[in-house]
Every structure is written in C-alpha cells, then in structure tokens.
Amino acid sequence: MAELLAIKWDDNRDKLILLDQTILPNKIEYIEYDTAEGVYDSIKDMIVRGAPAIGVTAAYGLYFAAKVAPEDNFENFFKYLKEKSAYLDSSRPTAVNLSWALKIMESKALENKDKDVKEIKGILREEAKRIHEEDIEICKAIGENLITLLKDGVGILTHCNAGQLATSKYGTATSPMYLAKEKGWNFKVYSDETRPRLQGSTLTALELYEAGIDVTTITDNMAAMVMSQDKIDAVIVGCDRIAANGDTANKIGTMGVSILAKYFGIPMYIAAPTPSIDINTKTGKDIPIEERNSEEVTSRFGVWTAPKGVKVYNPGFDVTPHENITAIVTEKGIVYPPFEENLKKLFEK
C-alpha cells in the first residue's frame, strides 16, 4: 500500500506537483504546475482541496506570480504581487488558510522591500517551502494532542476529508488515526461518504485503506444508526474556518453530524490548525459560504440523478454551532468552552 500525498514540491525543477483528487479513487495521477493561473484553476476545480492544502498551494502560486513580476522597482513588483494575491484569494472564499498564506507571502515581500527584487523572489520561494513544512509539523502536533482524548479500541466517525489528502501530510482529523496505527492500537473508523462530492468515500476511505487502517464507509444518512448502535465513541472532523466564538465552518453535513453527536452524548472534536481560526470573524453568521455548481447534486459519473432543470441549492459548507462542539484541538493545545475566551488565550501563548 502506497502513501498518498496531496502536495509535492520539485526543488530541482521549481514545480508544484498536485495529486488530482477529482479522479480518485479510480486513478492516481499527479499534475505539475508552475504558474499562478494554473494554481488558481487547481484550487477552483478542486484538484487540490482541504483548507491547509489550499493554503500551501496558494503560497506556491503566489511565488510563481512573483517569478514573472516586474523587476524594475519594488513598487511595480508589489503591485503585481497584490493583484495576483487577490486573484488567487478569489478561488475558494470559505477557506481562511487561503488568505492567511497569501498574507504571509505579501508580508514577507514587504519585510524585504529594500532588497533587490530578484532576491525577494528567491525569498518568497523559500517562504512557500517553509509554509509547506510548517503544515506537516502542525498536523502531527494536532494528532499528538488529539490522541490524548482517545484510547485503544475507540470507534471514530469522521466526515468529509480532513486527512492527509487535505493537508501536506498526516491530516488534521486523521492525524491521531495515523499515530494510533503507529502505536499498534486496534480501532475502527467510520467515514461518511459526504454528498455531493463524496470526499469521505473517494478520499478519506481511500487514504485510510491504503494506510492499513480499519475503515468502513457509510452514507451520510447512516450516521445516526451507527451512533445508536454504540459503534462511535468520538466524532473528529476538520474545519475550513472557526469564528471567534467557536462556530465552525466545515463541509456541508458537518452540522447535522454535530446535532446527532450531541443527542447521543458523543464528544465532537474539531481538528484545527491555528491558521483556520479567524478571531476577526465574530460568529458563524459572518463566514461566507460558497455555493457550488448545481450539477454536483443532479448528476454523477455522467448520469443524471435528478430531473434536468430542477432547482438546486448546493452550499459547499455549513456552520456547526459552538454549543455542539466538545473541544477544538490545535497544534498549540486543546481548547474547551467557553471558546470566545479560550481561543483568545490560545493566541496569547
């Protein structure tokens, strides 16, 4: 069984290599990128997906923009960089890691504005690589914190893909699963298929299966059943953005899972890199929710599954109320309610 990585960097050829997640699990193919425009398309078309992976990819995308930016003076260079940053930021509006990574790249350019533009381009290359490596370290630390809340023999339910395929490595929600596997634990994972794009069955189930982890795929409407049968001891999901009060935007269907978990008395854990926490967003009502193409709902594998022309509502995300969340687990530690107070403390450390 092979390790699947969503993002690879070819240092010798200066190319970003992304796993095409739109054709999984039927084919495993990688696509090479070396332009900001290509990176934009990869994010928009969900070749790469998952908030952390999107952020890392965008950082490389802005480096590619910097490579072809004007070199006559810093002002013209930075103007071009800002334009391309806004362009990349528009590819997926919900994932806060996207704007976070782009702002870091912009700040790094400003910090070095007195240097030669050619030198700044090299600095941005190294900064994108640093963001990539940092994501790996963050994911492992999240797993190390999460595993303290679990025990051998645990049954875990997860929704969508907050796994290795959504990050640089380990994943967020799946990180404790990989670490538990290394420890020799016996445990089971139930993966919601996650309509309409099926990330749970095509991505999460695939990567866990390839890693030799005991994973069972269920349809989204089976979650209540497996909870009622005492198969689930913990729900662990990722996030795309967390508001200051703890409200959490994640893949559509997560809110429903949280309601079920609360009803059955099952702890609901959010695996969250700190870049996904947006202290400037007061509540979940302030988080922009992306609406996606209607055909994601009405057709599958080239076959119509609903009447052509029928009205479709297809939000890509929903917001889990903070009241339904047991803890938010970050690389810096575990955050318990009251979230508005304790999330602030997290950034004071």
UniProtKB/Swiss-Prot annotation:
Enzyme Commission numbers on file: 5.3.1.-
Keyword field: Carbohydrate metabolism, Isomerase
S-S bonds: none
Gene Ontology BP, a term: pentose catabolic process
EC class of the enzyme, as a word: isomerase
GO terms assigned for molecular function: S-methyl-5-thioribose-1-phosphate isomerase activity
Entries under Pfam families matching the protein: IF-2B (PF01008)
NCBIfam families, per database record: eIF-2B_rel, PRK05720.1, salvage_mtnA
Family the UniProt entry places it in: Belongs to the EIF-2B alpha/beta/delta subunits family. DrdI subfamily.
Listed name of the protein: 5-deoxyribose 1-phosphate isomerase
Organism: Clostridium botulinum (strain 657 / Type Ba4)
